[in-house]
């Protein structure tokens, strides 16, 4: 019997997804305005977040539910290390630090892993499915905006172990639907996914100060004034 979790997550996070895509930093990024100093701080935050998520998922490799959604092909830690080496140099570990919003995000991942590991599914869904869905578009924007013509700095968006991203996403969603969870657990996973979108938004918002310094408040306001319809909202409309 299907849990219908994939559709619950898609419908239940639609508003949060759209809100995240309307954060100023994200809107500027999608319009091709990316400032390298801000972007590398985001990469550093992602390194801590994905490291925590992947470590905690691995801790539950024998869990009857969490283990089903733990696909090693999705792991981003190693690709983020490559990007950090590019943006910061060989001693990147000595230079990066976790922002307050990033720290709250990591703490939440550690907390639910210890108390209700099924909720890790929400964080996997929020990050990995988004990475697969928009990865190539974001990669191309980053390459153009930051003049990354040497093929480096975008390893995060490359899934070397996934040959067909569309087929993999379908498999991922099917796996969500096959999870042996009750309705209450499914609802808590949807709630946690909405919280995860909120934590991502806070990380993006932290970066807006640096971006405004780089491009100026007038341009920032021009780029972010109009509300953008989110990807999930457009899909529903179609």
Swiss-Prot record:
Keywords: Heme, Iron, Metal-binding, Oxidoreductase, Photosynthesis
Record-given protein name: Heme oxygenase 1
GO MF annotation: an example: heme binding
Gene of this entry: pbsA1
InterPro entries: Haem_Oase, Haem_Oase-like, Haem_Oase-like_multi-hlx, Haem_oxygenase_CS
Biological source species: Nostoc sp. (strain PCC 7120 / SAG 25.82 / UTEX 2576)
Function of the protein: Catalyzes the opening of the heme ring with the release of iron. Key enzyme in the synthesis of the chromophoric part of the photosynthetic antennae. Upon overexpression in E.coli with PCB:ferredoxin oxidoreductase, CpeS and either CpcB or PecB permits synthesis of phycocyanin-coupled CpcB or PecB.
Sequence similarity: Belongs to the heme oxygenase family.
Keyword S-adenosyl-L-methionine: no
Signal peptide segment: none
SUPFAM superfamilies on file: Heme oxygenase-like (SSF48613)
PANTHER family from the UniProt entry: HEME OXYGENASE (PTHR10720:SF0)
Entry keyword Heme: yes
One Pfam family here: Heme_oxygenase
EC assignment: 1.14.14.18
GO terms (BP aspect): heme catabolic process; heme oxidation; photosynthesis; response to oxidative stress
Catalytic activity of the protein: heme b + 3 reduced [NADPH--hemoprotein reductase] + 3 O2 = biliverdin IXalpha + CO + Fe(2+) + 3 oxidized [NADPH--hemoprotein reductase] + 3 H2O + H(+)
């Amino acid at each position: 019997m299907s849990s219908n979790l994939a559709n619950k997550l898609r419908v239940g996070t639609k508003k949060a997804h759209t809100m995240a895509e309307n954060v100023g930093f994200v809107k500027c990024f999608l319009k091709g305005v990316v400032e390298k100093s801000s972007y590398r701080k985001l990469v550093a935050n992602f390194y801590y977040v994905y490291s925590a998520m992947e470590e905690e998922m691995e801790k539950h490799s024998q869990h009857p539910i969490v283990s089903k959604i733990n696909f090693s092909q999705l792991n981003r830690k190693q690709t983020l290390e490559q990007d950090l080496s590019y943006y910061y140099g060989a001693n990147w570990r000595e230079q990066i630090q976790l922002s307050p919003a990033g720290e709250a995000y990591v703490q939440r991942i550690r907390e639910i892993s210890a108390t209700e590991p099924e909720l890790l599914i929400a964080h996997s869904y929020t990050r990995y499915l988004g990475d697969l869905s928009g990865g190539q578009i974001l990669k191309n924007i980053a390459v153009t905006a930051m003049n990354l013509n040497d093929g480096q700095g975008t390893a995060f968006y490359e899934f070397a172990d996934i040959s067909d991203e569309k087929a993999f996403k379908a498999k991922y969603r099917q796996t969500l639907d096959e999870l042996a969870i009750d309705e209450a657990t499914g609802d808590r996973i949807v709630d946690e996914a909405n919280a995860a979108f909120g934590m991502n938004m806070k990380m993006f918002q932290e970066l807006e100060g640096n971006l405004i310094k780089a491009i100026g408040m007038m341009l920032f306001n021009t780029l972010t004034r109009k509300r953008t319809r989110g990807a999930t909202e457009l899909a529903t409309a179609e």
